[in-house]
Structures are given as C-alpha cells and as structure tokens.
Amino acid sequence: MFASRPVVHPLEVAAPAHPVQQPAPGVLMKDLPGMPGTPGGLGLRVLQLLFAAISLAVMSSTADFASVSAFCYLITTTVLQCVWSLTVAIVDIYALLVKRCLRNRRAVTLFSIGDGITWLVSLSGACAAAGITVLIDADLIMCSENPCASFQTAVAMGFMCCFSLLPSFLLNFYSIASSHG
C-alpha cells in the first residue's frame, strides 16, 4: 500500500522580545460593548433617553392623560428614566473623553442597582398604561373619544425604553457576578 505521508518541517520562530506584553491565553475582555464608559454603553443610554423622551412627549401631549392614574404613572416613570439615562450618559461621555475605565466595583454596582430599579419601574409603568390602553381600545371601544393612537405610541416607546435598558442591566450585573468569582 502506497499512501502519501505528509512531511512536517518545523519552523523556527523567534521568541517575542517582551513576553509580559502579551495577554495570557483565555483572558476575557474586561470592557464588553455596552458596559459603562464604552461607546456601546453610551449608545444604549442615548437610546434609553430617546425612547423615554418620546414616550413622555407623546403621552403628555394628550389632554386626557391626567384623568388616568396609569398614564400619570407612565409619565412619572419616563421622567425617572430620562433623568437616570441622562446622568449615566454624562458619566459615560466624561469617561470616554478622559479615557477612564468605569470598572470600579462600586460604580458598576451603583449602575446595576440603578438600572435594575429603573427597569422594573419603567416596565411596570408601561404595563399599567398598556392595560388601560387595551381596556379603552378593545373592551370599551372608546377610541373615538380618546387619542388611542397617542396612547399606543407612548406605551410602545415605554416598552422600547425597557428593552433598551435590559442589556445595560444584564451587562452590569454580569460584571458584578464575574468579579466576585
């Protein structure tokens, strides 16, 4: 039987001049895209601020929002979300401008707790307003008397705000969990 056998010729490669400059194999990235102080994190904060501001503007432009407590609650939660996202976006911009890392355990814990609280509050506000919107639109069939399209748009933007906040919370929470292990 005549089978070809590959011949392996070893290459002589010079060792690196400074082996300490190379990262150890298997090291995880410290700054995941979306973490505080990264361009991805700033992008998520801008999205959160944008969705919350649109929800706030659309809901407050209707004349009937003050008569329904769930709509007032949605406005309150979007104001809270706007303040939180703007504050953290300013911190992200500062960190990017001065090239500082925000991987301090206390800072990431603060961001994670703040993101978790604002996510839950924003989600509850969007769900409450969605329930009333469905009640008005589908059950009571009162859209001729109410601006249902505005209510639905504000609720949709409230949910989009929640969905854009979730990656920030999960990345910060993962960072806290991985730093303790």
From Swiss-Prot:
The keyword NADP does not apply. Residues 1-38, 99-115, 175-181 are cytoplasmic. The keyword Transmembrane helix applies. The chain crosses the membrane at residues 39-59, 78-98, 116-136, 154-174. Keywords: Cell membrane, Membrane, Transmembrane, Transmembrane helix. Residues 60-77, 137-153 are extracellular. One of its GO terms (cellular component) is plasma membrane. It is found in: Cell membrane. InterPro entries: CASP_dom (IPR006702), CASPL-5 (IPR045009). It is a multi-pass membrane protein. PANTHER family: CASP-LIKE PROTEIN 5A1, CASP-LIKE PROTEIN 5B3. Homodimer and heterodimers. Belongs to the Casparian strip membrane proteins (CASP) family. This is CASP-like protein 5A2. It comes from Zea mays (Maize).
